Amino acid sequence: MSTSGAAAAIAPEPQHGPGPVATADDEVITWAEFRAWERQLARTGACSRPIRLRGTSAINTASGEVAGGVLHVACGNRRETACPSCSALYKGDARQLVRAGLTGGKGVPESVATHPCVFATLTAPSFGPVHARRMRGKTVLPCRPRRDSKDWRCPHGRDISCPVRHVDEDPRLGRPMCGDCYDYEAAVLFNFHAGTLFKRFTTYLPRHLARLAGVTRKKLRADLRIRYVKVAEYQARGIIHFHAVIRLDAPGTGYTLPPPRYTAATLCDAITLAARAVRLDAPAGPGRPRVRLGFGPQTKADPIWRQPVIASGQPLDIDAVANYIAKYATKSADVPGLPGTRIRSAAAIVALRCPAHHKRMVAAAWQLGSPQATGDPRLRQWAHMLGYGGHFLTKSRRYSVTFAQLRRTRAEHRRLERQGDGVRDPWGRPLDDTIVLVVNDWTYAGRGYAAPTPGAQLALASADRARGR
């Protein structure tokens, strides 16, 4: 395995400093040991569980010295529960990616800010009544109040009314009023096919936009391109919905303003119509061959930039949109109480320590993915994600900068920082290309920090405090 930058990553720490350091357990460590661990943490961005590589970095052909050992590489996990540090880095990149497509920067011209742009939310339909926090302005409304004298009991005899004004932290939010009435099969199938539904939405959107603008589809393709970035988010009921920034550009590789007939108001209306048109018949379990899926009626589209006519709502704040999408690009990748890895057996589902509602969704995905069912066998692969197996942040090719470009820029910046005092070899001496042979030969050695030494514990505590700030 070849790893760039490995030579600098295992450079030995100079043996000098103010003296020994005492840990919380009164264990004395040397300043050099603490600084060595601190440098390791800095190189991995204080990663919680880095990848450990063992091998050789370089060879001094004159002296025979070999630079090698254990190299720690950041895990790069974007899940907030798996690694707060790598997740925070991913969140920052996501924010820059979204913001660049709204205001310019990172190679995108600032003129993109004048383009028609909309923040859209596509939700799932109802699969049964659930507890919800309902608002009117800033007032919290009763969840499901009884408004007439009809019987508010379901076919199973359960009361499906709820007069409670739920708070944000109420654990009942998203839970069905009656678990036996709730359509768990359809809910899991919606999650599984959510990516396909969004793809169909992007197919229907240009058609409806052309009709509303009074042009043919061919003329629309000649006039503009639709760029977007979207993030998937779990609702409290465990169902995926999408938030998307959708922008109109003229054709070509640049970021040119499209013709003035295509406004944000027209785009808002087209988004609503396209979402209503999406339909997908998915195979289900025995005795129920097909389930018709589509987006719910609560599709929302709001302009981000002011246009001559605004279809609905008020223009949204750019920072709020960028921060919102970046937040859920990392947070939504986790389902509370469920493992981050695949479930291997039905017995593992029984042992899950999560809300009963989520456990029933996992069980439904497992059952639909069984060889006896008519569903897709990949449902078992994504049972721990309640059926959803797609990416949580995706974008069209030319919306803005890419994650890879941001990472390359950051790596180059760090390389230049390290070279500020002159290029040095792995032994801390001025680099002599004629005698230092760079090898960079590494093999996988494990996960996590190599040894829980006092220096490691103290450095990790420092990293935790830094993340807290």
Regions found by a protein language model. Give the residues of each.
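Catalytic micro-motifs at enzyme active sites that drive phosphoryl/nucleotidyl and oxygen chemistry
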Residues: 68-72, 105-110, 214-236
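Long, contiguous juxta-domain segments that are non-catalytic but functionally important
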Residues: 70-117, 122-159
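Histidine-centered divalent-metal-coordination microenvironment in nucleic-acid enzymes
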Residues: 83, 120, 220-253, 325
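Acidic/histidine-rich catalytic neighborhood
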Residues: 238-244, 278-311
